[in-house]
UniProtKB/Swiss-Prot annotation:
UniProt keyword list: Hydrolase, Lipid A biosynthesis, Lipid biosynthesis, Lipid metabolism, Metal-binding, Zinc
PANTHER family in alphabetical order: UDP-3-O-ACYL-N-ACETYLGLUCOSAMINE DEACETYLASE 1, MITOCHONDRIAL-RELATED (PTHR33694:SF1)
Catalytic residues (UniProt): H264 (proton donor)
Family indicated by similarity: Belongs to the LpxC family.
Protein name: UDP-3-O-acyl-N-acetylglucosamine deacetylase
Reported cofactor(s): Zn(2+)
Length: 303
């Protein structure tokens, strides 16, 4: 039986918001079965809860943001990605600000945080969203697509006219499992170009950005002293983002995802298109005594 998972203990972290630059206190708490992932703005009076739901996405410019009852939660994708990677279904995320902390720009610190809290199995089967028919969305030359597949596979292709991102390092595929996610995807950082900085600052974006939490490129090279963590870190980060964006569907995906120059907006459009097409997907679970799911999660981490 593949059971739902939550945290064993409450755990806290502090950081800055990538776009707001605000200091933010974050607390992750265990949650009961079928609760799902819910963000809680504890700085508001009264406190407002914002479920991790693709239908609540209102912001897709350089991050994924949710709005519910007037309360915003920005830059959810890296934590959502870590939760998906470790198979966590139920958690309460308390925040003292409208944006999650960026940490080092990857989901690695969130993975460490979740493992430190401990992950426990709950007494109910985990629910998966099984893709039954292809679903595709396009925007110009950008494409995002789901197809039926026995497991969870992600493929992504980026196209940047930059010497540090040659064509041979612009494609990545991953057969999803916790170990593959942690090793191959979780440490890939967000990235940005110096030329875009002015655009971002004019829109009050990237105010908390620095080389401590992003890969920064000028016209020719990577400016970070330590260089890259993977030769194709850029496309790996796009997969990290996609895993987080797709987890807003409300369950773990069983299917194949393909992205070509996709981003937060198109990923969200794909999830909405999928959920709107009742014939294209179904809920499935794997209760005790039935077949094993075609996706491997790590054994629970008892902190």
């Amino acid at each position: 039986m593949t059971q739902q998972r939550t945290l064993k203990n409450t755990i806290r972290a502090t950081g800055v918001g990538l776009h707001s630059g605000d200091k933010v206190y974050m607390t992750l708490r265990p949650a009961p079965v079928d609760h799902g992932i819910v963000f809680r703005r504890v700085d508001l009076e009264p406190v407002v809860e914002v479920p991790a739901d693709a239908e609540l996405v209102t912001e897709t410019t350089l991050c994924t943001g949710l709005t519910c009852n007037g309360a915003k939660i920005q830059t959810v994708e890296h934590l959502m990605s870590a939760l998906a990677g470790l198979g966590v279904d139920n958690v309460i995320v308390e925040l003292s600000s409208a944006e999650l902390p960026i940490m080092d720009g990857s989901s690695g610190p969130f993975v460490f945080l979740l493992q430190s809290a401990g992950i426990v199995e709950q007494n109910k089967a985990k629910r998966f969203i099984r893709i039954k028919q292809p679903v595709e969305v396009r925007e110009g030359d950008k494409v995002a697509r789901f197809e039926p597949y026995e497991g969870y596979k992600l493929g992504f292709t980026i196209e940047f006219n930059h010497p540090m991102i040659p064509a041979k390092q612009s494609r990545q595929e991953i057969e999803f499992s916790t170990s593959a996610y942690v090793k191959e995807i979780s440490r890939a950082r967000t990235f940005g170009f110096m030329r875009d900085l002015e655009y971002m600052r004019e829109r009050n974006l990237g105010l908390g950005g620095s080389m401590d939490n992003a890969i920064v490129l000028d016209e020719f090279r990577v400016l970070n002293e330590d260089g890259l963590r993977y030769t194709n870190e850029f496309v790996r980060h796009k997969i990290l983002d996609a895993i987080g964006d797709l987890y807003l569907a409300g369950g773990a995906i069983l299917g194949a995802y393909e992205g070509f120059k996709s981003g937060h907006a198109l990923n969200n459009k794909l999830v909405r298109a999928l959920l709107a097409d009742q014939a294209a997907w179904e809920w499935v679970s794997f209760p005790e005594g039935t077949e094993q799911p075609p996706v491997t999660y790590a054994s629970p981490v008892y902190a």
